Amino acid sequence: MDSLTPELLAPYLRIESEHSIRAANEFTKEVLDFYILGDEKTGYELPWPILEDKFRLRAGECTLLGGINSSGKSLVLGQMALVAMTQGAKVLSVSLEMSPRSQLIRLWRQSSTSMTPDIDFGLLFNAWCKDKLYFFDKEGSMDMDTLEAGIRYSIDHFGTDLIMVDSLMTISGIKNDDYSAQKDVVCRIADMVRDLECHIILVAHARKSFSIRDKLDRFSIRGAGELTDRVDNVLLVQRTYNDDPDDPDVTFSVSKARHWDMAECDLDLWMDQASMNLLAQNQKAVKLLLDDEDLDA
């Protein structure tokens, strides 16, 4: 095989450019779908019904989920994954900070709404999600090339369409002050979601502030400014540390939603200790309904 020199690749690059320049009328169907079919309301709903018509996880978009350490980012990821799977999502979890075993222990609890889910339910749950949930079984760190290859492989072989990457700082070769590398990662992720028609959630940490009570916004994310500029959406998770047990435990914020009208908002959430689910006011934890047919599938 010939070496892939710039000269050899040049004709293909020109073809790609030709296909990238398209007349406005070629997009007519997509615009009609938006206005007539309600295409703007596509995507996976989040666990809180109040956001149903305000914001969803849509194909072709990427989301940054931010917060300080121990704010509940991984907890929220699991809850999002669980709710998305009930809507037909196929999820790939790339958690370099939490093993598949640990994630499933938590998911059993969240889906059963019980602090100690029984074994029968757990076995049914694992059978139910066998073609809905996949793990990139690696801990520690990986480089961006390996991450991208794994994502493309999972989409090609398993049809995954919701990818959760926890977190930015576990991608090897990226330092806190290496803004150029951070920008490269988020740009590649943004390109991938459009190319592959999937949704990627990337977890990032907030800058260390003088007080854990300081309110976060999208400018609080640690690292290059391009992180929040390049992504389509920014979601924030912040513990409130209130003294009154009746006050909310967490504030969940839609801090940026590029393709949604007036979606930015703050949502108060309360922790249900038994299930480890975060619930909006007057919302109840709902057990996932499973039956023996899932074992036979």
Regions found by a protein language model. Give the residues of each.
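Charged helix-capping and loop-helix junction motifs
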Residues: 179-188, 217-221
